[in-house]
């Protein structure tokens, strides 16, 4: 992705909006009747030039392959980091099966990922800016700082809840539920922004919710956990995992709705592109999580934190940075996975923004849905998971609902384009 002239600022809009803007040098309207012949010649020449510059099949294949390769690798590494256990020390004669530990340092993982994303996002922003022009500021106005801080806080808080849920549910349930972002986004739009939705959207939400519930209830380990919890008189740990994941999805929804508000309000915050959001959000997230990791041990050692908070914080949380460094020094193979996870995540975002700059958001919706399905299938085969008939039914309901939404949106977009063409 060499330095090139960007067609137009990439703006993240709602899923039914077209992301690909027309270039600035497209033929302009000529109001002078005497110049109509010259205007027609200019129009013909510009159309030939536009056709020559239009993205082709190989460019489409490059974008799709980049998104698939980046996020499928990212998903495999995420599952390996968060679910695989490692022995605390090598086996000995006295202890042939030593205790095992798992990477549970979500704030550290989030910090590394946001750092990679901020750097790569800035490089994309720099090289996609036309030569001779100033690189767009990631904080163009003072008004935009508050929503950007809110986005960085909500995205930084979402990850710990999501990773904590993996202690109670399996990765397949996690991935399937993460595919259902429409539910919290709609909830927040209805309650905060008083936005109305077409009837089919509620049908999609119903299908997705039923799918996740079906998948969870038919999980082989879920019934065992519920039965064991019933004999103990306690609530099932899988229910607690779903609760933690629900908080994660709600925070993700807050992140997405705030981003939509920024992009759809240029009169308040000026025009703000996708790469600008990527850099600003990840820079602020890195600052917030880094400050937390560095300040938390000092607050803990002085006793100020325990005096303020009514609930005690686990020691592992107070010294997460030290504990994470110690864990990675004991298991250097995990460090490679963490760095690869951050790199693939950042590259995936770059391919998404590049795809949006060359094609429409409709293509991206299709690629995203199929990518999530492939992530689940890759997890099944890579890590040897087995799925029951009920779980396959749940997966079918979820992706059937998401796919139906994509089809309806595509038809709506075609209808709008046809109507606009008739009025020209």
From Swiss-Prot:
Per the UniProt record, one Pfam family is UAA
Which residues, renumbered to this chain, are glycosylated? 256
Q: Does the keyword Transmembrane apply?
A: yes
Q: Where are the transmembrane segments?
A: 57-77, 107-127, 144-164, 173-193, 197-217, 234-254, 293-313, 337-357, 380-400
Cellular location(s): Endoplasmic reticulum membrane
GO cellular component, as recorded: endoplasmic reticulum membrane; Golgi membrane
Topological relation to the membrane, as annotated:
Multi-pass membrane protein
Alphabetized, the UniProt keywords read: Endoplasmic reticulum, Glycoprotein, Membrane, Sugar transport, Transmembrane, Transmembrane helix, Transport
* GO process terms (BP): UDP-galactose transmembrane transport; UDP-glucose transmembrane transport into endoplasmic reticulum
GO function terms (MF aspect): UDP-galactose transmembrane transporter activity; UDP-glucose transmembrane transporter activity
Q: What does this protein do?
A: May be involved in specific transport of UDP-Gal from the cytosol to the Golgi lumen. Involved in the maintenance of optimal conditions for the folding of secretory pathway proteins in the endoplasmic reticulum.
What is the similarity comment for this entry?
Answer: Belongs to the nucleotide-sugar transporter family. SLC35B subfamily.
Report the protein name in the record.
UDP-galactose transporter homolog 1
Organism, as annotated: Emericella nidulans (strain FGSC A4 / ATCC 38163 / CBS 112.46 / NRRL 194 / M139)
């Amino acid at each position: 992705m060499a330095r090139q002239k960007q067609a137009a600022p990439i703006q993240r809009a709602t899923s039914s909006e077209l992301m690909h803007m027309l270039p600035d040098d497209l033929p302009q309207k000529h109001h002078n009747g005497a110049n109509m012949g010259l205007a027609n010649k200019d129009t013909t020449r510009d159309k030939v030039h536009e056709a020559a510059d239009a993205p082709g099949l190989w460019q489409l294949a490059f974008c799709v392959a980049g998104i698939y390769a980046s996020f499928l690798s990212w998903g495999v590494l995420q599952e390996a980091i968060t679910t695989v256990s490692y022995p605390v020390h090598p086996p000995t004669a006295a202890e042939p099966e030593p205790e095992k530990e798992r990477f549970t340092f979500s704030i550290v993982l989030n910090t590394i990922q946001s750092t990679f994303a901020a750097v790569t996002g800035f490089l994309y922003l720099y090289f996609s800016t036309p030569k001779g022009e100033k690189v767009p500021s990631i904080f163009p106005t003072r008004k935009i700082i508050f929503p950007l801080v809110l986005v960085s806080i909500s995205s930084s808080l979402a990850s710990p809840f999501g990773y904590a849920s993996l202690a109670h549910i399996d990765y397949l349930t996690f991935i399937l539920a993460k595919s259902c972002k429409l539910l919290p986004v709609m909830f927040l739009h209805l309650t905060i922004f008083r936005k109305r939705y077409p009837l089919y959207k509620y049908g999609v939400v119903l299908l997705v919710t039923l799918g996740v519930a079906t998948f969870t209830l038919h999980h082989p380990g879920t019934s065992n956990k519920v039965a064991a919890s019933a004999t103990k008189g306690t609530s099932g740990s899988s229910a607690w995992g779903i609760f933690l994941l629900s908080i994660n999805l709600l925070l993700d929804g807050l992140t997405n709705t705030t981003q939509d508000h920024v992009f759809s309000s240029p009169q308040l915050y000026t025009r703000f592109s996708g790469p600008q959001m990527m850099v600003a959000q990840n820079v602020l997230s890195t600052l917030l999580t880094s400050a937390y990791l560095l300040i938390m041990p000092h607050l803990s050692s002085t006793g100020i934190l325990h005096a303020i908070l009514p609930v005690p914080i686990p020691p592992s949380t107070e010294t997460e940075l030290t504990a994470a460094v110690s864990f990675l020094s004991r298991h250097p193979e995990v460090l490679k996975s963490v760095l690869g996870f951050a790199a693939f995540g950042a590259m995936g975002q770059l391919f998404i923004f590049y795809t949006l700059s060359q094609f429409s958001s409709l293509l991206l919706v299709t690629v995203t849905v199929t990518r999530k399905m492939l992530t689940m299938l890759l997890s099944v085969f890579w890590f040897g998971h087995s799925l029951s008939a009920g779980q396959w039914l749940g997966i079918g309901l979820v992706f059937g609902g998401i796919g139906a939404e994509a089809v309806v949106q595509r038809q709506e977009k075609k209808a709008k384009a046809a109507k606009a063409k008739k009025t020209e």
